[in-house]
């Protein structure tokens, strides 16, 4: 996994032994996200302009608030992002998350996540700096083994 961590732009990339369609499902289906995304149930219709939200599995706590900016299955998803799990981060401006999927050989997909527009959001930048590596490692493990990385 490659990582570039700066205050305003963070880039993470991983190669996953799965098709782009399988990776897209893992990104967009809550039955997958709860197994690798810190237990978050990601909820969206993935139509531009619609909400993109992350919840605890019982929906008692909202973790992420955002909106779908662009969705081009199974190649690209762009959302706005505001962390709701931390009071200081929730007060910061929205940032942007871009998921890019590209074939990297037969049955292999390169997944790149770019989290940017973090200017003026130091708490969010610090929170997600370690988080994305864990999320992508969890997704890779789940898709390649059928088992979650932790828990």
Where are these regions (language model features)?
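A short, structured loop/turn motif at beta-sheet edges
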Residues: 20-21, 69-76, 100-110
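Short beta-edge strand/loop motif at the mouth of beta-sheet-based domains
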Residues: 11-12, 31-63, 76
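Hydrophobic/aromatic beta-strand elements that line small-molecule binding cavities or substrate pockets
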Residues: 13-14, 64-70, 95-103
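Hydrophobic pocket/interface hotspot
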Residues: 23-24, 33, 52, 68, ...
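A generic structural micro-feature
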Residues: 4-8, 58-62, 89-93, 105-107
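Hydrophobic ligand-binding cavity/cleft-lining segments
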Residues: 1-43
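Beta-strand/loop substructures that line and gate deep hydrophobic ligand-binding cavities in soluble
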Residues: 86-133, 151
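Short, highly charged C-terminal tails/helix-capping segments
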Residues: 141-151
């Amino acid at each position: 996994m490659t990582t570039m961590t700066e205050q305003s732009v963070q880039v993470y990339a991983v190669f996953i032994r799965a098709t782009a369609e399988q990776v897209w499902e893992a990104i967009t289906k809550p039955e997958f996200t709860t197994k690798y995304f810190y237990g978050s149930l990601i909820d969206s219709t993935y139509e531009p302009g619609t909400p993109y939200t992350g919840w605890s599995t019982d929906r008692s706590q909202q973790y992420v608030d955002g909106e779908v900016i662009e969705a081009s299955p199974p190649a690209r998803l762009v959302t706005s992002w505001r962390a709701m799990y931390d009071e200081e981060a929730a007060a910061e401006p929205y940032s942007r998350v871009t998921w890019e999927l590209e074939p990297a050989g037969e049955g292999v997909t390169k997944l790149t996540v770019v989290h940017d527009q973090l200017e003026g959001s130091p708490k969010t930048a610090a929170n997600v700096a370690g988080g994305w590596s864990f999320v992508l490692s969890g997704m890779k493990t789940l898709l390649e083994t059928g088992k979650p990385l932790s828990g």
